[in-house]
UniProtKB/Swiss-Prot annotation:
Key word DNA-binding present: no
Annotated protein name in UniProt: DNA gyrase inhibitor YacG
Gene Ontology terms describing biological process: regulation of DNA-templated transcription
Pfam families (UniProt xref): YacG
The protein's role, per its UniProt record: Inhibits all the catalytic activities of DNA gyrase by preventing its interaction with DNA. Acts by binding directly to the C-terminal domain of GyrB, which probably disrupts DNA binding by the gyrase.
Species, as recorded: Geobacter sulfurreducens (strain ATCC 51573 / DSM 12127 / PCA)
Residues noted as binding Zn(2+) in the record, renumbered to the chain: C7, C10, C25, C29
Length: 59
């Protein structure tokens, strides 16, 4: 049985077995997704963390 998955970046169907880029369909989608994290396009839900400037303002 061949297991397929949907690439989280481009939504293309790809095969899981033997895919060195999984869960992505290609190295390009993997790199584009990494760049999106680096550019802070994705965020993890939760309260906003205080910035370094906030600590200096309290002194």
């Amino acid at each position: 049985m061949i297991t397929t998955l949907t690439c989280p970046r481009c939504r293309a169907e790809t095969v899981w077995e033997g895919n060195p880029h999984r869960p992505f369909c290609s190295a390009r989608c993997k790199t584009v997704d990494l760049a999106a994290w680096a550019d802070e396009e994705y965020r993890i839900a939760g309260p906003e963390a205080p910035s370094d400037n906030d600590e200096n303002d309290r002194e």
